[in-house]
Amino acid sequence: MLTVDFIESIVAQMTPTITIENVVDNGDGTQTLSICDTYWIRKYLDITIDGNSYVVSSFIKDTSVTIPSTTLVTVDTFVLTAPYYFHGSPMQVNNEFMISKKDANKYPLIYLVESLTDSHYDELDSRDKDTNLRIFFLDSFANKRDEVDAYYSNVIVPLNASLNYFVELLKSDSTTLPFSYDVTNRVKVGVYSTNEGNTSQIFDDPLDGVEFVSTVTLMKSDECKC
């Protein structure tokens, strides 16, 4: 399996079931859900509960989520949608993904940077390959005026939760050997320079993100290749 497809299969599993412990009608057109693990839920995220779509009004990490009360929530659980996934060079991502999709349809985004270098083992080795991964977990709040002073709690913290869940799934995959990894919080990753300062624009959208870097060893799969 190609590395880009393997990572896509991991991202597709990022659909945790969230338990709602309590629902309070705030009497102001909103309702607050008590939730122990908010994962990557953040303000303005679209979530679906019992077939109804809500835009998150506010949240407290791993405590509660406030949404409109047009339809009061009566179920105990809901499934969080997996982040969007894209791979390619920065120019490909900007041209094919950032420009072609509206804001509501592309964030949060998990972006696997290419080109990828895979080091393959001998055919008699139980290991398949070492793959060098550089993955960005990205989100944008540039058009939300009230987020200027709160980007860290509203963007970086949820993105770290998204990264942690991804790593948990990656490590639990049967073909993955134990690995270490580096994490870097990236503010305004839409602007990039190889030297000092931010001088060269890569993405049209101004983004905040979390960068994951690791070399992961994958074992050969037992699946039939017939």
Where is each model-derived feature located?
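Structural beta-strand segments of beta-rich domains
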Residues: Q31-L33
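Short, charged interaction patches at domain edges and termini
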Residues: M1-P16, D118-D130, T176-C226
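Short beta-strand-to-loop capping motifs
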Residues: S69, F137-S140, V216-L218
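Short, solvent-exposed beta-alpha or beta-beta edge segments that form flexible loop/patches at the rim
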Residues: Y84-A150, V189-P206, C224
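Well-ordered, non-membrane alpha-helical segments in soluble/globular domains
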Residues: M1-A12, N154-L169
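Small/polar beta-strand repeat architecture
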Residues: I18-G27, C36-Y39, T48-S89
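Loop/turn positions that initiate beta-strands
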Residues: R42-Y44
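Acidic, metal/cofactor-coordinating or nucleic-acid-engaging core segments within structured domains
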Residues: A161-V183
